[in-house]
From Swiss-Prot:
Protein name: tRNA dimethylallyltransferase
Gene designation: miaA
Annotated source species: Rickettsia bellii (strain RML369-C)
UniProt cofactor(s): Mg(2+)
Region Interaction with substrate tRNA, residue ranges: 36-39, 160-164
GO molecular function, a single term: tRNA dimethylallyltransferase activity
Length: 315
């Protein structure tokens, strides 16, 4: 029996994934499923450039902006939710189209994942209380005693990873990195993944990155982050989306708005460069779509269903 198709549309930030994926879903009777680790959070749709409501009104979108920013989210949790949505979409006769640039999620979905046990809520609260009392440096020192491997790999300024590693070693008695040596678990072995990699020319991509981030700053991102700062302690939130730290620094009068934007643009370009390198080296079997200007991109959009040899539907 032939395997069912799943499309994964990936690429660096600002490469046009959302636009292209939306057009593809409309052309091929598909539904969109998020595969971006930051676009799951409901309080930050602007800074994460989540798909607009106009897109969501035309076709079904799944796993976008549904999770409170206070809730921890792991690759295992994502995979379970994604598998449910993929099975639901295919059961309805539609084509699942996954869009995003989070390499860990894509790699785990396609090639399998290391299943790290869930952390109990009691322990999670205890570790956060401890961190609040002793800070990053002392928590890193304590991690060194319990898990020297993790402490050597995790910078003490990386609060989220530091807390996560400390939780895991307390919960399991094992290093968080020890789980990487275990056999990987596959959850969608009955599917065939067709991976499309958007590969814009570097200079063109950087131009789009700068323009998009400037628009994001103008279109409400500052108010969005100001509200989060008012309601929550940012130290305990999963605020890794580029631009958030810079806006927080602006709100705390540590940077001017221009400095915050310039710094965020620089970080975005560096992030895009790392993404391109990762996709080129980690995902060997893929369809690469190259383009160097807006006209090239529009041509790719018009011809995509032909280029990747897709039927009009997955029925």
């Amino acid at each position: 029996m032939p395997k069912k198709e799943i499309i994964i549309l990936c690429g660096p930030t600002a490469s046009g994934k959302s636009y292209l994926g939306h057009a593809l879903a409309k052309a091929c009777d598909g539904e969109i499923i998020n595969i971006d680790s930051m676009q799951v959070y409901k309080e930050i749709p602007i800074i994460t450039a989540s798909p607009p409501e106009s897109y969501k009104s035309e076709i079904p979108y799944h796993l976008y902006n549904f999770l409170p920013i206070t809730e921890d989210f792991s690759v295992v949790k994502y995979l379970k939710l994604a598998a449910e949505k993929i099975n639901q979409v295919t059961a309805s006769g539609k084509l699942p189209i996954l869009i995003g640039g989070t390499g860990l999620y894509i790699n785990s979905l396609v090639f399998g994942y290391n299943n790290i046990p869930d952390i109990s809520e009691d322990l999670r609260q205890q570790v956060r209380k401890l961190h609040n009392e002793i800070g990053n440096t002392e928590l890193h020192n304590r991690l060194t005693k319990l898990d020297p491997l993790a402490s050597s790999k995790i910078n003490q300024s990386d609060t989220q990873r530091l807390i996560r590693a400390y939780e895991v070693v307390l919960q399991t008695g094992k290093s968080i990195f020890s789980f990487q040596t275990l056999p990987k678990e596959q959850i969608l072995s009955e599917f065939n993944f067709k991976i499309i990699f958007l590969n814009p020319e570097r200079k063109f991509l950087y131009k789009i990155c700068d323009e998009r981030l400037a628009n994001i700053f103008k279109d409400g991102a500052i108010d969005e982050i100001a509200l989060i700062k008012k309601q929550f302690n940012p130290d305990y939130l999963n605020l890794k989306a580029v631009g958030i730290k810079e806006i927080l620094a602006y709100l705390e009068n540590k940077l001017t708005l221009s400095e915050a934007l310039n710094l965020a643009q620089t970080r975005t370009r560096r992030y895009a460069k790392r993404q391109i390198t990762w996709f080129k080296h980690q995902i060997k079997e893929k369809i690469t779509l190259d383009y160097s200007n807006e006209e090239d991109f529009l041509q790719v959009t018009r011809k995509l269903s032909i280029l990747i040899d897709l039927p009009n539907s997955n029925k």
